[in-house]
């Protein structure tokens, strides 16, 4: 435990090897524009025995023209957006919707789990993520190291063609579509890959996202993770590779997050090392809180999920009184 304590103390002040590339915002501009113009193409109400909520499944198209699906729960009394002027929005529209992203290889959370948010009066949208490659299907269990994940999803020679780029695009489209469909801002939340998606959405969609939460977010401090491949910035080629992986770095995205953020890290996590998570956390410029779990690895942490509820109640109360 002494070793973990020393590692934690060293990590607390770490900010990562490299800051955000100068072309970060311009790189994502096309994706953001697409997301802000995307819309729900179909919405199907699902049968339910409860009157406490309405269950739907919506479809919409991502940047590569793949049709995505998401689960939607509307608490009783909440409906989809109406063409009202801002001053005419009902009081319930002040409450944001929770947009949930799953970890790599893990399916969408159950309808029952999603009800924990709708019980607070918050609509919920949960992306049904596209299938991943077979060798990545156990990533959510912590079966791959940070370097293995980065090598699989990040192309240092061409960030735009990286698998991770498309997965972040999916998150941007989901958050923007959810905000427009429900007529309110969103809380983006995810674990692992989903945590990175949540943070990128908060960074790049400031009008659509009002709070973000991430547990063990992947792909933070990519230049350190991939140092053997991208080098140390001592040649033009190395500089270019470092910038490329920085475009897909959740710690770089964190520099643009202005909304309240709750971040969690597990000290035994080899997929999302604590050092990278602190690099991300220390670069968040706005209101932020960190939770550290010494005895956990890359896994679901019930204590964090319980603390989420208290955090949401506090933050949303502040949002509604502003």
Which positions does each model-derived feature cover?
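Cap/lid segment of the alpha/beta-hydrolase catalytic domain
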Residues: 114-116, 123-168, 224
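N-terminal targeting or regulatory segments adjacent to alpha/beta-hydrolase or S9 domains
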Residues: 1-53, 79, 84-91, 120, ...
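Hydrolase active-site cap/lid region
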Residues: 195-243, 292, 300-303
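C-terminal catalytic histidine-bearing segment of alpha/beta-hydrolase fold enzymes
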Residues: 278-322
């Amino acid at each position: 435990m002494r070793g973990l304590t020393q590692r934690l103390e060293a990590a607390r002040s770490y900010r990562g090897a490299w800051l955000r590339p100068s072309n970060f915002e311009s790189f994502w501009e096309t994706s953001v524009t697409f997301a802000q113009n995307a819309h729900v193409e179909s919405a199907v109400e699902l049968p339910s025995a409860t009157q406490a909520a309405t269950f739907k499944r919506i479809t919409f198209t991502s940047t590569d023209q793949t049709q995505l699906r998401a689960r939607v729960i509307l608490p009783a009394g909440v409906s989809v957006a109406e063409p009202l002027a801002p001053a005419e929005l009902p009081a319930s529209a002040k409450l944001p919707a929770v947009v949930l992203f799953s970890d790599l290889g893990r399916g969408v959370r159950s309808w029952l789990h999603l009800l924990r948010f709708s019980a607070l009066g918050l609509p919920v949208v949960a992306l049904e993520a596209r299938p991943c490659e077979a060798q990545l299907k156990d990533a959510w269990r912590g079966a791959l190291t940070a370097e293995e994940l980065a090598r699989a999803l990040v192309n240092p020679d061409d960030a735009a063609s990286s698998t991770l780029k498309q997965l972040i695009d999916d998150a941007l489209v989901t958050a923007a579509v959810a905000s427009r469909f429900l007529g309110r801002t969103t809380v983006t939340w995810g674990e692992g890959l989903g945590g990175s998606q949540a943070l990128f959405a908060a960074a790049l969609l400031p009008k659509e996202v009002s709070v973000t939460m991430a547990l063990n977010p992947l792909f933070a401090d990519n230049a350190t993770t991939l140092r053997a491949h991208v080098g140390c910035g001592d040649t033009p080629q190395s500089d270019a590779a470092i910038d490329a992986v920085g475009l897909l770095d959740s710690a770089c995205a964190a520099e643009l997050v202005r909304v309240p953020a709750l971040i969690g890290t597990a000290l035994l996590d080899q997929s999302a090392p604590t050092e990278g998570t602190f690099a991300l956390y220390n670069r968040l410029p706005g209101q932020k809180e960190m939770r550290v779990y010494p005895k956990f690895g890359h896994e679901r942490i019930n204590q964090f999920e319980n603390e989420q509820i208290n955090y949401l109640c506090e933050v949303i109360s502040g949002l509604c009184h502003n």
